[in-house]
Amino acid sequence: MGDAPRKLTIGMLKAMPRKWDVFGNWAIFEEQFDRHSNEVDVFITPECFLDGYAVTEKDWTAKLFDGVAQDVQESGYIQRVRELAKETQTHVVFGFTEGLEGHFYNTALLVGKDGKVVGKYHKTHLQHSDHRFARGEDLPVFDLDFGRVGMVICADRRWPESIRVLRLKGAEVCLMPTYGMWHVNNEWWMRTRSYENQMFVCFTHPNVALITNPKGEVEAKLQSNVPDVLVHEVDLLRVTNDNHLANRRPELYGVLADEEHPSRQAAYEPPQVDSSAS
């Protein structure tokens, strides 16, 4: 007999938040969570959902941003997320702007089904308006009752090393709140990240919710213009270390992390092309 399935039901909020509208965005979250929390083990929001990813606004100021940033210890919204998680026995990944020690962070907070904060992730790769945030300095993984998960946020997915680190730390699922690019190229990226790491990736965006599986296939997808939740069950027994992960050659990859590696310092001059020869 084979191993019993390790089933996990994931709920992914697909809804477009309004910038600066914390009250209205919370109402969307609460309505959809109330509707679907009894169906899922984990519920995920898009990136910075609470403030509507206001960091990109042209009228952005630090003073305005401070008005929507949340302190994890003091925020009434965060406290309510914890209460909802405990009441429904649901793990929650909640995206918001965090104010911490004089800095702003693009944060994904992981709340356990007991209502306790399991941990949080600060976006590590910042581009464009995101430079108004401070950078995260870690790629943590978290143990939950069903298995081990990791989180990245939006643009972090552009760097393959980010999700590879999570997988090498034992993560079976990458939970990914996002707000930016979501077209077909992104679908290829997510399929590739899943395939090369033999894991599930849960891409949660205002316009689309997408789950890709260890074979690099689209496992589930929901795309529409109205608030909704993708609910889908995955079997974590499909996550293995066989195949290409087992055949890695890490002794050859030092150049990826070593800024002083000789191969990175070697000067390279591309060959000159004689345009007159054509």
Language-model-derived ranges and their functions:
Residues G2-G11, V141-G150, V173:
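Beta-strand-turn-beta hairpins that frame and shape the catalytic cleft
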Residues K14-W20:
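Short polar catalytic/cofactor-binding loops
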Residues V22, A27-K113, R164, H183-R191, ...:
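Cys-nucleophile CN-hydrolase/nitrilase-fold catalytic domain and related Cys-dependent amidase chemistry
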Residues Q70-H91, C154-E233:
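CN hydrolase (nitrilase-like) catalytic-core segments centered on the catalytic cysteine
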Residues G99-H103, R132-F133, V201-F203:
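Short loop/turn motifs at secondary-structure junctions and domain boundaries
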Residues F104-H122, V208-N225:
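Amphipathic beta-strand/beta-sheet edge segments enriched in Tyr/Trp
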Residues Q127-P140, R158-E161:
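Active-site glycine-rich loop that binds ribose-phosphate moieties when present
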Residues V141-D143, T192-R193, C202-S278:
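C-terminal beta-strand edge segments of enzyme domains
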